[in-house]
């Protein structure tokens, strides 16, 4: 596990710093451990970090380390919770042609950060809602599929 380094706060302009750190780490793992299947995850602002990493092939707005195409196959799955872009009708599954099919963009019912809901408690209750367990099962399936497809190619 790796905790992305960035100043998580209400200041969403810090997302670029997190995206730079995550991209740098992904690229490093892909280069030094090419057989490793990487799983990306994020919650709330961390989900926004994953949005940038997986959808921005060019630098901009403080994001200076875009993920090169060669690193994309090393990511087996992406799971995000409480993703702010989903509230705008743009979940990560739609935003990213490279990662969409490998992505679970999960939102609790009535979570106001990722839906039009108004229950702020639901934004902090992902473990209790069962979505974390569901995501873990989904990730396991995708990692196993990537191992199988890599072994057969």
Model regions and ranges:
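Serine-dependent carboxylesterase/thioesterase catalytic core
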Residues: 19-100, 104, 113
């Amino acid at each position: 596990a790796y905790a992305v380094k960035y100043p998580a706060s209400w200041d969403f302009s810090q997302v670029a710093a997190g995206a730079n750190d995550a991209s740098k780490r992904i690229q490093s793992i892909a280069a030094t451990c090419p057989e490793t299947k990487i799983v990306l995850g994020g919650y709330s602002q961390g989900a926004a970090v994953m949005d940038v990493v997986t959808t921005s092939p060019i630098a901009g707005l403080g994001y200076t380390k875009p993920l090169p195409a060669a690193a994309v196959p090393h990511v087996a799955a992406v799971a995000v919770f409480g993703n702010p872009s989903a509230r705008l009708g743009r979940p990560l599954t739609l935003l990213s042609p490279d990662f969409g099919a490998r992505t679970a963009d999960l939102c609790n019912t009535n979570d106001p950060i990722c839906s039009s809901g108004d229950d702020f408690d639901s934004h902090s209750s992902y473990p209790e809602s069962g979505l974390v367990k569901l995501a873990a099962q989904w990730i396991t399936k995708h990692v196993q599929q990537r191992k199988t497809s890599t072994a057969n190619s």
